[in-house]
Amino acid sequence: MEDYNNQMDHESSGGRGNFLYASPNLGGNYGRAASDHQMGINTFHLQSSGGGGGGGSGDQCNFQSPGTHPINVKTEATTSQHGHPKFQYNNNNNNHHLVSSSRGHQPVVHQLQHNLDLQNDDHSLSSNEVEAIKAKIIAHPQYSNLVEAYMDCQRVGAPSDVVPRLSVARQEFEARQRSSGTSRETSKDPELDQFMEAYYDMLVKYREELTRPIQEAMDFMRRIETQLNMLGNNNNAPPLRIFSPSEDKCEGIGSSEDEQENSGGETEVPEIDPRAEDRELKNHLLRKYSGYLSSLKQELSKKKKKGKLPKEARQKLLSWWELHYKWPYPSESEKVALAESTGLDQKQINNWFINQRKRHWKPSEDMQFMVMDGLHPQNAALYMDGHYTGDVHYRLGP
């Protein structure tokens, strides 16, 4: 498939797009001499003409191959005497018109073009040979699959009012196939078999290429829809739907009966944001414990932060610190005396001395030797009582 040109015609005409693709050598050369191996480019032009009402309507599908005249496939609202589909062929200037109808039903555009290059070197085939080739194609066992594959391509991205018509036309075609009772034996023409298989595979691949971008767009919009609904749940907003229930079916994407049977009825679950569950749990806990949290916050706010000690108490502690700088470890009796003079409790006094020693005191070398040698505590009492007479000057605290 070299290119795809999907341009919508005027809405009043109800036409579908044009699609351009390259056919395989075998498919494009059926009915031609085997010496020609060029790759044919086939152009499909599907148009609708005429209006509704009692007068009937007609639709035309034009197909053209390189070096040949366009081949027109057309359906009109005509009725045969026996109520069966009627096929008419006009062979003027190599233009072929296929007219099909059934009793009691309004016709819908469903045509399948088999690209037949009916030129053999410089000589055209006779009308009888053309009719024989077309009859072989219609009678081929693969013909019904080819029609269904073509209709599946038409369903991809079709408007909501066209999809039901396509479904009805497909059911009518299947009913006519069953009622005709035509025996479809195994084909004995290998070239025709390969021709039918090549075009069937081409239509299947064409449908997959059409479906992929539309399906990706639908998945993206579903994810956006899910995320918007999650954001709106906090405000108790009604759920948002980007697609209506009819559009949510992707307008025929992946709706072929074969795929539905193979899928086992499973539907694709839209992707969910992994953080949505955490947010939902957070909101639930806030709603349940918001009262406790607010009361706890108020209780904590009432507690004053611990401030500095009174200035007078700090001055008394610093005076004791300067007198006992060599060994600033007050005894229990001294702590009680300091507590009475400063008005502080022993815990505050202990904390003040711990912080003061960490910040402003370092044992002298003599004191370190005394601790290492394990001297008698009576010698250490000299430092505690202030009787140690040394030349080292005291360092005043802040």
Curated annotation (Swiss-Prot):
CDD domains given in the database record: homeodomain (cd00086)
DNA-binding region: 301-364
Keyword presence, Kinase: no
Family that this chain belongs to: Belongs to the TALE/KNOX homeobox family.
Protein name: Homeobox protein knotted-1-like 1
Pfam families: ELK, Homeobox_KN, KNOX1, KNOX2
Function per UniProt: Probably binds to the DNA sequence 5'-TGAC-3'.
Organism: Malus domestica
Listed InterPro entries: ELK_dom, HD, Homeobox_CS, Homeodomain-like_sf, KN_HD, KNOX1, KNOX2, TALE_homeobox
Recorded GO CC terms: nucleus
Ranges of biased composition (kind: Gly residues): 49-58
Subcellular location: Nucleus
